[in-house]
Amino acid sequence: MADMDSHKRIAVMDLGTNVFNLLIADFLPDKYSFVKEFKCAARLGAGGGIKTGRILPVAFGSAKEALSKIMQVINETGEVSLIHPYATSAVRDADNSAEFVTAVNGEFGISIDVIPGEREAELIFKGIKASGVFCNLKNGENALLMDIGGGSNEFVITDGHSVLYKRSFPLGMARMREKFNYSEPIGKEVAEEFAGYCYSQLNELWQMTERYKPVILVGSSGSFDTFKDYIYNCGLKEKPYVELPLDELMAMNNVMVKSVAAERMRMPGMSPVRVDFIVLSSLFTQLVIKQVNPKAVYQSGYSLKEGAVAELYEKWRETGCVADNLL
């Protein structure tokens, strides 16, 4: 273990397509702990930006407003010596991503780390691993990890210790909602067309699941948080992971596909930022379950930002430093 300060407080941001997430953590020589978590809507694809491949002015404004709120939380928490923002699909795929990164740096003084999809999948794996959910794997068994995002969906196959396969697919729900424009409730033909399209785009994943035969499916954060809140009526908040009974997931899907936005907003734990996308998320999850046939499905409350904290903590323990963009 390298020489280090006895304490360091860091802030990690996950700048997603629909939501910006903040996690503040304290590093001590023998452990780390979470101090503060905050999230707010950002809608980087607003105004048709996903379809045009650009972060449009309305999205710039929304993102800056979200970052202002996040920076206020960081300042109010105090003692943060490092801020590490990770940007994912909406920023990395935008033609004007460099312009966005420069604008954020100029206004807030933070340097955004725009990460590729495979790196995103790696951090998601580390976050899910930190949740402890892999204790449900027996020796020789594998798990399929899935993170449903706004711009992309990440998949990882793991034995609980190492990554056997990882891939990011540009099939995020904000992207799919633009592609499959429909009036509510979603019609059977549109639902089948959506499932068929996703199935064809995931051919490589199906080959890998046939090869590694994962026995459990773990969905992280985002849509799976909403699934958990629906099934458990917003209970079990303190648990880093929970099992989502397959029969209840199926029943929930049947409710979702028949619902309209006003009905979904009355459902337990429904976030306004997810109300337009949760139907497709549910259909996508059912497609994966049908194809993979896991014996159990779990929700992990830990994902990219928790994985980033775990990784930065290990670096701090080994080297005594975390990163270059210190405040």
Q: Can you annotate each of these PLM segments?
A:
Residues 32-44, 78:
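N-terminal glycine-rich anion-binding loops that anchor highly charged ligand groups
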Residues 20, 32, 153, 163-164:
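Hydrophobic residues embedded in beta-strands of well-ordered beta-sheets
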Residues 17-19, 128, 149-155, 222:
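Ser/Thr-glycine-rich phosphate-binding loops at phosphate-binding pockets of nucleotides
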Residues 3-23, 32:
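N-terminal amphipathic/basic leader segments beginning at the initiator methionine
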Residues 7-10, 24-27, 45-80, 90-142, ...:
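Helical "lid/coupling" subdomains associated with nucleotide-phosphate turnover
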